[in-house]
């Protein structure tokens, strides 16, 4: 259909592709997929190297550029993201005898906390049973919800009483 035969059609009529033919599967998949954030890429590369190993600034720039960021246009954004991560304490500059002066590593406390959080999330997912579509909430959740409602009803009609005798003059 896409090829035009010279003898069959006039020069004035052109073949216009329909919407389904114009959008290929690769176009649709690239639109739906989004790039990860720069901070996520930086933290991921540092986490892959573990706590003891350090990563140079050039390696981080390469990792960010591989994910699809144009580093010639986004150097200011890269610097800003690095500075924010340093201010938050998620990463730190290496000042001891390890690596170059521009090398960075993941903060030990943050790395340990993230490992504990990941383990807790996995434990919760294992312990939770998937609910059926028509199933009601579990009993502990219902108790919490009902207690919240009762507290709201208790305090709904209560008026505030003035503290002490502010308005009374002796």
From Swiss-Prot:
<dbReference type="Pfam" id="PF00538">
    <property type="entry name" value="Linker_histone"/>
</dbReference>
<keyword id="KW-0744">Spermatogenesis</keyword>
<feature type="region of interest" description="Disordered">
    <location>
        <begin position="118"/>
        <end position="140"/>
    </location>
</feature>
<dbReference type="GO" id="GO:0030261">
    <property type="term" value="P:chromosome condensation"/>
</dbReference>
<dbReference type="GO" id="GO:0005634">
    <property type="term" value="C:nucleus"/>
</dbReference>
<comment type="function">
    <text>DNA-binding protein that may be implicated in chromatin remodeling and/or transcriptional regulation during spermiogenesis, the process of spermatid maturation into spermatozoa.</text>
</comment>
<keyword id="KW-0539">Nucleus</keyword>
<dbReference type="InterPro" id="IPR005818">
    <property type="entry name" value="Histone_H1/H5_H15"/>
</dbReference>
<protein>
    <recommendedName>
        <fullName>Histone H1.9</fullName>
    </recommendedName>
</protein>
<comment type="similarity">
    <text>Belongs to the histone H1/H5 family.</text>
</comment>
<keyword id="KW-0597">Phosphoprotein</keyword>
<keyword id="KW-0217">Developmental protein</keyword>
<dbReference type="GO" id="GO:0000786">
    <property type="term" value="C:nucleosome"/>
</dbReference>
<keyword id="KW-0238">DNA-binding</keyword>
<feature type="modified residue" description="Phosphoserine">
    <location>
        <position position="56"/>
    </location>
</feature>
<dbReference type="GO" id="GO:0003677">
    <property type="term" value="F:DNA binding"/>
</dbReference>
<dbReference type="GO" id="GO:0007283">
    <property type="term" value="P:spermatogenesis"/>
</dbReference>
<dbReference type="GO" id="GO:0006334">
    <property type="term" value="P:nucleosome assembly"/>
</dbReference>
<feature type="domain" description="H15">
    <location>
        <begin position="34"/>
        <end position="108"/>
    </location>
</feature>
<dbReference type="InterPro" id="IPR036390">
    <property type="entry name" value="WH_DNA-bd_sf"/>
</dbReference>
<dbReference type="InterPro" id="IPR036388">
    <property type="entry name" value="WH-like_DNA-bd_sf"/>
</dbReference>
<keyword id="KW-0156">Chromatin regulator</keyword>
<keyword id="KW-0158">Chromosome</keyword>
<keyword id="KW-0805">Transcription regulation</keyword>
<keyword id="KW-0804">Transcription</keyword>
<dbReference type="GO" id="GO:0030154">
    <property type="term" value="P:cell differentiation"/>
</dbReference>
<keyword id="KW-0221">Differentiation</keyword>
């Amino acid at each position: 259909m896409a090829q035009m035969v010279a003898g069959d059609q006039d020069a004035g009529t052109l073949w216009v592709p329909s919407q389904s033919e114009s959008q290929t599967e690769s176009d649709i998949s690239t639109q739906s997929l989004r790039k990860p954030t720069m901070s996520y890429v930086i933290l991921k590369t540092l986490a892959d190297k573990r706590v003891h190993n350090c990563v140079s600034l050039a390696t981080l720039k390469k990792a960010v550029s591989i994910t699809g960021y144009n580093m010639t246009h986004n150097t200011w954004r890269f610097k800003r993201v690095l500075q924010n991560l340093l201010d938050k304490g998620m990463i730190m500059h290496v000042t001891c005898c390890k690596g170059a002066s521009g090398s960075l590593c993941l903060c030990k406390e943050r790395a340990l906390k993230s490992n504990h959080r990941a383990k807790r999330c996995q434990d919760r997912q294992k312990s939770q049973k998937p609910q059926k579509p028509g199933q009601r909430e579990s009993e502990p959740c219902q108790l919490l919800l009902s207690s919240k409602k009762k507290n709201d009803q208790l305090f709904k009609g209560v008026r505030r009483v003035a503290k002490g005798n502010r308005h009374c003059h002796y």
